[in-house]
Curated annotation (Swiss-Prot):
Belongs to the universal ribosomal protein uS2 family. Gene3D superfamilies: Glucose-6-phosphate isomerase like protein, domain 1, Helix hairpin bin. Residues 255-264 have a biased composition (Polar residues). InterPro entries: Ribosomal_uS2, Ribosomal_uS2_bac/mit/plastid, Ribosomal_uS2_CS, Ribosomal_uS2_flav_dom_sf. PANTHER family: 30S RIBOSOMAL PROTEIN S2 PROKARYOTIC AND ORGANELLAR (PTHR12534), SMALL RIBOSOMAL SUBUNIT PROTEIN US2M (PTHR12534:SF0). Residues 243-264 are annotated as: Disordered. Residues 243-253 have a biased composition (Acidic residues). The gene is rpsB. NCBIfam families: rpsB_bact. This is Small ribosomal subunit protein uS2. One of its GO terms (molecular function) is structural constituent of ribosome.
Length: 264
């Protein structure tokens, strides 16, 4: 029995690909037909790939593996954050910072800085600073929280990454490929299957499609672990998901994260 039924895939519109002018020829083997200028994805092949990909996720979760959830496009942000937090997994829903994987040591220094700022504000020590400095520190804290808050408990490189739209998240995929970290992806007809280790061919734009696949992955992880467990080892209730909608971040480099200028 498949993890997801054909009926569920059809109802969520997983079979609708991009316009025929937007496609990657390497994806051809997963395309069923063309209808009115739109590619139709072969859901029989999607089901087979779901079984293969979800078997891997289930096995990895049972072994205590860490999966980094990545989804920065607007329609994926809230869903990805919700499922990552429900399962206790790290996530990126603002812009992917170059080097998040390949230069993880530097990224960890930014996380350490965020923890330092949190301590300053929570302890009240920040009140000893001049007002202008407090404002700058608050802005820095907010930026760091937006860009690295979802990975703050990730003390090592993940065992795999799950990506919604690998074409948009090309840098994340490239970094994972370079380090030999398996890539699991919900990938549409404009994607290159050759850079994805575990592909779920399907609509990566429609909210219902993204939600179906991502939520089922979340269920698998929770079921495999008997409840979520975050990367710091604290238990996470599957129902404890007090999530605010993810904000649409801006692309920045590490220097901008500590700058007092820019978006806050």
């Amino acid at each position: 029995m498949s993890y997801i039924s054909m009926k569920q895939l059809l109802e969520a519109g997983v079979h609708f690909g991009h316009e025929t002018k937007r496609w990657n020829p390497k994806f051809k083997r997963f395309i069923f037909a063309e209808r009115n200028g739109i590619f139709i994805i072969d859901l029989q092949k999607t089901l087979k790939q779901i079984d293969r990909s979800f078997d891997y996720i289930k096995d990895l979760a049972e072994r205590g593996g860490v999966i980094l959830f990545v989804g920065t496009k607007k329609q994926a942000q809230e869903i990805v954050e919700l499922e990552a937090r429900r399962t206790g997994m790290p996530y990126v829903t603002s812009r992917w910072l170059g080097g998040m994987l390949t230069n993880f040591r530097t990224i960890r220094t930014r996380i350490d800085r965020l923890n330092e700022l949190d301590d300053m504000f929570e302890s009240g020590r920040v009140n000893d600073r001049p007002k202008a400095e407090r404002i700058e520190l608050a802005a820095e804290r907010e930026r760091l929280l937006r860009f690295v808050g979802g990975i703050r408990k990730m003390t090592r490189l993940p065992d795999a990454i799950f990506v919604v739209d690998p074409t948009k998240e090309v840098i994340a995929v490239q970094e994972a490929n370079k380090l030999g970290i398996p890539v699991i992806a919900l990938a549409d007809t404009d994607s290159d299957p050759d850079v994805i280790d575990y592909i779920v061919p399907g609509n990566d734009d429609a909210i219902r499609s993204i939600q179906l696949i991502t939520h089922r992955i979340g269920d698998l992880i929770v079921e495999a672990r008997g409840g979520g467990e975050d990367v710091s080892g604290e238990r996470v209730s599957p129902d404890n998901a007090d999530i605010e909608a993810a904000e649409d971040g801006e692309e920045v480099d590490n220097a901008q994260l500590t700058s007092s200028q820019g978006r806050s």
